[in-house]
Amino acid sequence: MKSILFSLTLVFTALACFAQDYYGNNRKQWLQKAEQYKPKLIITEKKPLKVVDIVPDTQSFQKYKAVDVSPIDSLYSMPFRLKKEITIDFGEHLTGYFSFSVRSTGLAADGPLRFKLTFGEVPSEVAVPFDSYKEGLSRAWLQDEVVSVMYVPQTVTLSRRLAFRYVKIELLGSSPYYDFNIHDMKCMAQTSAKNIPEELPQAVDPMIRKIDRVGLNTLKECMQTVYEDGPKRDQRLWIGDLYLEALGNNYSYKQHDLTKRCLYLLAGLSDLNGYLLATVIENPVPRAQDKQFLYEYALLYNVTLKDYLEATGDMETVKDLWPVAKKQLDIVRTNVKADGLMDFEKVKKDWWVFFDWKEDLYKEAPLQGVSIFALKESYKLAQLLGKEKEVADLPALTNKMIKAARKNLYNRKTGLFVGTGDKQISYASQIWMILSGVASKAEGKKALSALDTTQNVCYPGTPYM
């Protein structure tokens, strides 16, 4: 009997050790700090400017454009029942909650109304029906809603947050015995971005100034209570988007508490083994998406932490999160081969290797590049913290991996970087070899120039790349 109990004790002890949390009690206080730095949303009432028609136009983006019809006030005084359908334009992209009011014009309302509302960021979204959508992601992400108004007059506020500029309103059902107006349409727009970034100097090319304004507005819309990868879809925090958005914030809005919140959230919701999960879903309560291990995102956390320290000088926070950054380095250490090349096949089995939404992208060279980049940036972080001794192996490992990349991945004749298993020439390979410093400035310039004259180049699939 004693031997059985002893055996059971060993089993349970082993299980407990197996399930042990790498960060222990730190997790709780990290999540508390994440909540502490949750920003207050700034709510601004925005009203539509005009009624528009969406018409086909081969010269416009996605083949549709908006044509002005009348000021918005004309809609508010017009009986709507015979109109049936109308599109309004807010004049700018907004993220927030839409509402409208209805009132009868004359006879008392004797029945309910039903509307279909379609929201679009660009004209084509409200022009092309969603019926042909083949579900890959949830159909519910598409921004259309059927609304029944049981009593008139009434004000209706949609419960879902929307990201849009245009709204198409279609009347699906009404009583033939009374007419009504739609009026007082508005969006309670929200963002946590409260500071006003400096504009580029007037001497800068006007097109660059326009691009900068659009980029800043896009960042503002993504700055909610985390850096969202997109305010329309999928309204969550991804480490890769955090890296880019926080970097932009460092030079524009400079609201570093949002970055701090995201860094703490990701740390607090990391896997029990200490590795970061790529994405956090914030509502109804923050939670990480289980088993979502994304190779380069885990490493980019370290870079974001280093950038945050350089922007803020907040040693306390960064020292608090240093154990997380240090743990992510094991991802490289355990996957680099004796010759200094990353074990691409092994990494693919154990991790999601992303880089871009591009199915035919061969990722061996980008993997080598981002690994070197992350090691370099992590060592800089260690130097800023006075923690070099804790990662004393990094300089030698980095140099070994750089030499391996130049020996095995660089074609001196063409000036381009390619993989060992596939000779595909891609923008991703050149970009990550340049960012990592494997390529010199002259070599980087040559590689990017060569892409313009090389056939069968694998181009970026998305703006993220």
Task: Give the location of each predicted region.
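A broad, structure-centric signal for solvent-exposed, well-ordered loop/edge residues
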Residues: 8, 12, 124, 155, ...
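Extracellular/oxidizing-compartment recognition motifs
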Residues: 20-229, 241, 278-282
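Active-site core of glycosidic bond-cleaving carbohydrate-active enzymes
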Residues: 238-253, 257-465
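Generic N-terminal helix/loop capping motif
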Residues: 14-16, 218, 252, 269
